[in-house]
């Protein structure tokens, strides 16, 4: 995904496998992989962290070709899906951390703009997730940029 508020492209990502077939070197069955996903989720890992752990420690590049389900679908079947989508939660955490920084460092005007951009992204994502029904329609993020100025 490209960066939202700049003219540069987002280049930081791992290269996905060229084919979407299940690799021949995987010895685990789909049921065993689903159990690993459930176990890691109960340990408190997010879906992206689960995917990274499976890739790095178990040599499983993609879950979907093997299990015919995504990590999110596996978690949803087992009632382990988070209430708030992972990307929205991460951006809200980032905004809260930046708010804390700006309260301690009043002269940091540059990061006021960064907070504005982060909050704009929160609002855009929240509109999308409300529209598809992933978060409640009453969910609201309170902006603090207006209070800082």
Swiss-Prot record:
Keywords, comma-separated and alphabetical: Ribonucleoprotein, Ribosomal protein
Domain of life according to the entry: Archaea
Keyword Ribonucleoprotein annotated: yes
GO cellular component: cytosolic small ribosomal subunit
Secreted in keyword set: no
Any one Pfam family match given in the protein's UniProt record, by short name: Ribosomal_S13_N
Any one GO MF annotation of this record: small ribosomal subunit rRNA binding
Family membership noted in the UniProt record: Belongs to the universal ribosomal protein uS15 family.
Complex and partners: Part of the 30S ribosomal subunit.
Name the UniProt record assigns to this protein: Small ribosomal subunit protein uS15
Species this chain originates from: Nitrosopumilus maritimus (strain SCM1)
Record lineage: Archaea, Nitrososphaerota, Nitrososphaeria, Nitrosopumilales, Nitrosopumilaceae
Record gene name: rps15
């Amino acid at each position: 995904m490209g960066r939202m508020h700049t003219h540069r492209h987002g280049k930081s990502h791992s290269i996905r496998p060229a084919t979407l077939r299940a690799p021949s070197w995987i010895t685990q069955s789909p049921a065993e992989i689903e159990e690993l996903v459930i176990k890691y989720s109960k340990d408190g890992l997010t879906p992206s962290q689960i995917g990274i752990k499976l890739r790095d420690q178990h040599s499983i590049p993609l879950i979907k070709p093997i299990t015919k389900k995504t990590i999110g679908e596996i978690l949803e079947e087992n009632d382990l899906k988070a209430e708030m989508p992972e990307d929205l939660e991460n951006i809200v955490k980032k905004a809260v951390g930046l708010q804390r920084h700006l309260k301690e460092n009043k002269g940091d005007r540059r990061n006021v703009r960064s907070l504005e951009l982060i909050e704009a992204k929160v609002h855009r994502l929240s509109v999308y997730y409300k529209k598809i029904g992933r978060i409640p329609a009453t969910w609201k993020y309170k902006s603090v940029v207006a209070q800082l100025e």
